């Protein structure tokens, strides 16, 4: 978030792409959630509750479905759609069948952010336009984002 704070302070206009936590912060920023609010949300005890829900609940229920994260993002962002954002945004996730990075440029913002934040072994993958998506992948094991060309 520090980079976004400096760019905003200097009046530099940006397009945003991200993977995993970068998609969570970048998507909220592109939806014009203030950086101060994003920071407050990450430090808020309710968000900590959501983050704790990410942990798998072996053996009773298996891996986290990510539904708590999805509910949280929906409450924060409403029905925002990527293609309608005033700040260009793309989330990046990995197709688990092919290992190829998939750039999410349109559709529900909360769903794209949730897909990009689907840490393997922690979250269930997300279905998106015929792909089964997780964060990272063989080409980007840390969830790092390939450079994405945005307008």
Residue positions per predicted region:
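Patatin-like phospholipase
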Residues: 1-19, 27-151
């Amino acid at each position: 978030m520090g980079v976004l704070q400096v760019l905003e302070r200097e009046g530099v206009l940006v397009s945003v792409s991200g993977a995993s936590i970068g998609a969570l912060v970048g998507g909220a920023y592109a939806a014009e959630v203030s950086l101060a609010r994003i920071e407050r949300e990450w430090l808020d005890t309710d968000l900590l509750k959501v983050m704790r829900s990410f942990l798998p609940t072996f053996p009773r229920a298996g891996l986290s479905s990510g539904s708590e994260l999805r509910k949280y993002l929906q409450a924060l962002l409403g029905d925002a759609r990527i293609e309608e954002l005033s700040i260009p945004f793309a989330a990046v996730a990995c197709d688990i069948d092919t290992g190829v990075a998939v750039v999410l440029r349109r559709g529900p913002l909360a769903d794209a952010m949730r897909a990009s934040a689907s840490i393997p072994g922690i979250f269930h993958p997300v279905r998106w336009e015929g792909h089964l998506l997780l964060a990272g992948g063989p080409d980007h094991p840390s969830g790092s984002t390939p450079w994405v060309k945005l307008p």
